[in-house]
Structures are given as structure tokens and as C-alpha cells.
Amino acid sequence: MTQNSSKPVGIVGGGLGGLASACVLAARGHKVVLFEKSPWLGGKAAVLEADGYRFDMGPTIVTLPSVLKRIFAEAGKKIDQYLDLVLLDPQWRCFYDDGTTLDLRQKPSEMYAELDKFAPGSAEGYRRFLEYSAKLNDISQKYFFYRSVGSIWDMFKANSLFSPGLITDMINIGMGKSVASCVRSHVPDPKVAQMLDHFTQYVGSSPELSPAVLCSIAHMQTDEGIWYPMGGTRAVPLALVKLASELGVDLRPGCGIRRILTDTSERATGVETESGEKIELAAVVSNSDSVRTHRELLSGSKASGKFEKRRKYEAACSGVVLYLGLDKRYEQLVHHNFVFSHNAEEEFEAIYHKGIPAPDPTCYVCAPSITEPAVAPPGGEALYILVHTPYLRPGQDWSKMLPDYRRVILQKLASTAGMTDLESHIKFESFLTPQDIHDRYRVLNGAIYGLASHGKYAGAFKPANRSQDIPGLYLAGGSAHPGPGMPMALMSGWIAADVLDIDARAGVVTKPARTQPV
């Protein structure tokens, strides 16, 4: 494969990772064709519009705008030419079942003051936690981000094992520790700890099972802030689609892929569409779920079996999403809100160990009209409610489970967030269940966040962006490195494009060395 190959690079899937890959590759001079099964581009970052209400259907929080800036910079563009980003502060409001509330502020000095009023003595622990989070972020920037990584060996193989500071970095990364233990070693107050635990909800995993390195998310959010794109998070994929079109990418929504084609040496050579058309390609970037890519798009290949044997990947959690169009705004809400469970341990035990919906769940509530009134008719609200649930388990029929669980959710909002009259103000309603998410987005077992980040040692690692088994195949999206969440999915697309471009400029697609087991 060469950069000037007559064959285009194919992108399978038009989610955020696929769109990012397409833009970067096109900006670097590659011919690119993108295939997307759905009639829209953007994957989970879709939109629902009805009766004067507009809802972001998937992600609602934009963090790390530096990732987006990097993608647009590939084409010599500035992000503000495409997006109008508004900084949100407070970043979240937390509601507890004892009637107290706590705002998460971006500026540490303001947060220290909040904490010392809320839980005297917690400010110093939070300050130390942020210092530790910043160290973890520095290590992530050095070894983990913007490179194809599938294991701890990949993190360090580009660096001498005897390089200065390596041992210190290995110690500071907190291997063998969980997010929950790290948080509580700094901030023992249970309510403050519950707030900090929820940084891991960006990756759909239990803080008790996730590696401490994910505490770095706190620094990332404090450093770069939380942002809202006017027009909703749907504006992000629309901006990428606009950039891709300007760069000459051949965008094909409504064109699903049946399988990825390989030659006798199991090198990716093209795709077969669901209509039966076979298209030769210089290389393939799969923005489909990485496990389903191997099970379905590469079914029958030796590589599929190797992928499954290398490591047992578990789906991240799923969720129930309620889209409620209201004729009322709730003044106690800010843009982003967490309505917390009474007992976090019992909640996570239900979701991640028992595989059942939590009887007393935490509800994430997005009330965007405070920032963009146009999302609803005057005086109204386009309320988005997300409650994490287990990924799909055998025997779970969400068409029967949803009505009862909807009542649980609304009762939680009434008892803990004071939304006692919510039912009477609903003028429009829609929803997604784990089964809907599984069917709509073709993800593993209805997982919202790709693969779980569980495991105190290997939990941070997802499949590498350069396939270990199939030359010419690259992986992007929330189930590939560096993992789930809006900025990470975008970064995965950049990485997949970057390593593909490196291989193209070298004139060959070489099979990478085997990654050692963790």
C-alpha cells in the first residue's frame, strides 16, 4: 500500500471515530470512502426532533476539545470555524438522597471552597487527588495517547526500558489499585467520593473494578473544561461531515458492510456491501465494534479466532435513556446533573456483578435549555435521562422490563431531586433500552461504552488500532484504543488514521510483532 494508491482507503462505520479517521486521512492526501449502514452519520451522536423538542440521543458532554482541535488542524482549519462551543461551569450538580447538593466547579480554588462548606476538611484531599490525577495524565500523554496501544508492553516498547523516570512512572500509574480505592485514599467523605467515582461513568465501568489510571479523567476535565456545542453534541459529527466533504471524502450513508475481504495471507483487501458489491480497497479502518468486527465482518477467518483467544473482552454497561419533552423547566437543575443512589456499592453490585438493574439507581439528567433555549418550546425543557444498566443478559426482555423501571427512575427523580410533578409535565416521550441500543448501533450486547475498563492491571487497555493479526486493518471507535467516551472515540480515529498513514508512507503494510500478554 502506498499513499498514492489508486485504491481508496475504506472506513467501515460513520461514527465519531470513523469520521475522525476519514478527515485525517483525507487531509494527508489519501482517497477515502466511508460506508455507514444507517441513513445518518455520527453513530450514537444522533438527534431526535419531535413536537418542537430536540434531543441529543447519545453523548451529551464534550470534554478535551484539544482532540477535536487536532483533527481540524490536520486540514489547516480552526475548530471555531465549525463549532460554537460554550464552557459550562458548574460542570455538574450532584443531588444526594439526604437533600444536599454539591456543584463540581472547574476552577480548583472555587471547588475547594465548595468542599469545605459541604464536607469540612475535604478540600485538602481533593487538592491532593487533583495533583495525583495530573501525574496520571502526564503519564498517559507520554505513553498512552495518540499512539496504537493494546497492552502495557505497547506503552513502553517505543521507549528504552532503562529510560530515566520509567520506574517512577510505573509506580505512579497505580497498577493494582482501583479508582474507588484511589479516590477514598484521598477523599474519605462518602458523598464527595461518590461524585469523584463518577468520572468512570464516562467509560461505563465500575470504579471498584477499574484501574486507578482512570483517575486521570479528573485532571483532563478540570484542565480543559466541559463544553456544550450550540446545536447540541449532534453539531460535532455534523462539523466532521462538513470537513470530510470539503476534503473530498466519498460519504455513503445507508450502505452497510457484510464482510471485510481478505486475501490468502489474511491481508485486508476490501469490503463486500450488504447489496453484494465487492469493493477493492488499499486498507480498511473498522469503526464498528471491535469484537463484532472480528465475529461478524471477519467471520471464519483465522484472525477472528486469534482475537477472541488473546483476551476475554467484556461489554461495558448499557443503559435506559428517557427523552422527555416538558412544558416546564426545573430551576434546581443545571445543564448536567447526577441524582445519586443512596448506596453506590449496592448499585454497582447490581449492575456489574448480579447483572440486574439497580433498584436504587443513579440518574444522569441533562437539561440543556439553560444553555440553549431553542431545544424546547418557550418555557419547556428537552430532558435527557440516562440510567446505567447491565449489558444485555440472556432472558432479559426490556419491552416488559421498561414500564416498571421507568417508574423507578421517575420516583428517584422525585425523591432525590425534588421533581415531584414530572409525570404531569411530560408532553412528549421516547426512550432507548439496552435492546434498542444493541439493534440500533450494532454494539456488543447493547453496551453504550464499548468494552468494559475492568481489571486493575489490564483494564485500561483496549484492542490496538493497528490490527495485530490482519495487515491493512485498523480499528477505531469506543471499543478500540484508547477506549470509550466522546474524546477517546475521536482520538481513536486519529490514531487509526495516523498509523495507517505511517504504514502507507513506508510503502508496505507489515504485520506487527505480537503483543506480549499483560
What residues fall within each predicted segment?
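Active-site-proximal substrate-binding core of FAD-dependent oxidoreductases
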Residues: 262, 501-518
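A conserved FAD-binding loop/helix module that cradles the flavin
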Residues: 59, 478-500
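Mid-domain catalytic core of redox enzymes
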Residues: 249, 258-377, 517
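N-terminal glycine-rich phosphate/pyrophosphate-binding loop and immediately adjacent elements
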Residues: 3-143
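Helical element adjacent to the flavin cofactor pocket in flavoenzyme catalytic cores
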Residues: 216-268
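C-terminal segments that line or cap access tunnels to active or ligand-binding sites in enzymes
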Residues: 327-437
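A glycine-rich dinucleotide-binding beta-alpha-beta segment and adjacent secondary-structure elements
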Residues: 189-203, 360-366, 419-482
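Rossmann-like flavin
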Residues: 97-209
